[in-house]
Amino acid sequence: MDILTQIENYRPYNEQEERDKGLILDCLRAFEDVFTRENALAHMTVSAWVVNERFDRVLMAYHNIYDSWSWLGGHADGEEDLLAVALREVREESGVKNVRPASEDIFSLEVLTVDGHMKRGKYVSSHLHLNVTYLLIADDTNALTVKPDENSGVKWFTPDGAVEASSEKWFREHIYNKLNEKMRQFRRENERKGR
């Protein structure tokens, strides 16, 4: 199933996701280059809420640009298989080798504002990230390594500790708390199903 259909079929968790889903779909339909950074206004990105097998730890990286502990992920850069991008980004940004989807379904949707910043010596204007998030499960015994051009630390936190570690208030209140709520709900539903 293509990503447009996946997003069309996605059932929003709250008003934020409902409104952001509409904007993401509008952009997917309006722009041919939304999967690349050539679209300087808005482009597709992917994030991962990475948990361990017990769902009691969350993997975060200390993001160089945002100067904060943050979820893992990156730009689609022309790739429309966003789950594959999420898995690749987690491996690249953390060094974790054993990572898999908890589900192949989209876990969350967000439209994220990105302030103008310097990247590799060039100014990047403010823009939007049309973000798809996946819930991934990783082996928390794997060695962790930083990706110096993107982060300066990688660490496992308790779910609530991951929220507290972020210095980005908006992310804590609107994204990370939501992801923890959804993760706990996902775990309860799967326990009831005997998975």
Indicate where each model-derived feature is located.
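Charged phosphate-binding loop/patch that engages nucleotide di/tri-phosphates or the phosphate backbone
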Residues: 167-195
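Acidic, metal-coordinating catalytic segment for phosphate/diphosphate chemistry
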Residues: 9-47
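Generic secondary-structure boundary/loop-capping signal
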Residues: 32, 41, 66, 141-143, ...
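A short, polar/proline- and glycine-enriched secondary-structure boundary/capping micro-motif
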Residues: 68-74, 156-157
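Unchanged
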Residues: 77-170
